[in-house]
Amino acid sequence: MSQSRAVVITEASSPVALATAARLAAGGDLVLMGTRRTHICEEFAARLRSGGAAAFAAHLDLADPPSIDRFVNTADYLIGAVDVLVSAAGLADGLWVGAQHLAAQVIPPMIDNRHGDVVLISPELAGASPAGAHRMLEAWVGGLDAEFVGTGVRASIVRSTGQVPPDDVGCLIAAAISAPDRMHLRVVDVIPPVLTPTLAQERRRR
């Protein structure tokens, strides 16, 4: 990667979000994790920094508009204009509106810079499964597609019908945002692994 990207990850205390943060930070990106469970992400970010990565954590409650506004100011101070937004909200507990409110604040600079990525993570991968979430995600990414025409900004969904190892999801998110500008991985469908007897035994030994 020739240049570090400024990355925001929401609801960042989930296993998938933590794995994504670790992978992107290890690759040289500036990563800010937004979460209500700041103690988890602050400790995790400190471990990443001890290894030379640029990772930070800040309080973010997507159900509280003032918290979102404070988080955006914190992001501007710590990592600058956001290049990548990874939304792992799961769209539960009233977070849907807040997730869009945050996106509406960080997307305009991407459009101005004619480069950026917005990645939505399906609720199963984010550790939740609210009714109708898939339809909401499809509607959201469809709206973003229309907004991003000709701007150089891309919208993607990483989704699955079941649980997938967090590290694998982090790898796919990294691939989506690292694709050349001429490519757009709009939908990444992850097929959950088949739990064969041998694989089940290996997992029990871990």
Residue ranges and their predicted role:
Residues L48-P66:
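Rossmann-fold cofactor-recognition segment
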Residues S13-P15:
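Conserved glycine-rich cofactor-binding loop
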Residues G28-E43:
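Conserved glycine-rich Rossmann-like NAD(P)H-binding loop of the short-chain dehydrogenase/reductase
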Residues A103-A104, G142:
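A short, exposed helix-loop element centered on a Lys and neighboring polar residues
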Residues H101, V153, I157-R206:
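C-terminal helical subdomain
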Residues I111-D112, D117-G142, A146-V149, R159-Q163:
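Catalytic loop of short-chain dehydrogenase/reductase
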Residues R5-A6, G80-V84, V97-A99, M110-E124, ...:
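Active-site loop of short-chain dehydrogenase/reductase
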Residues S2, G51-F56, N73-S87, L91-L95, ...:
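A glycine-rich helix->loop->beta "capping" turn
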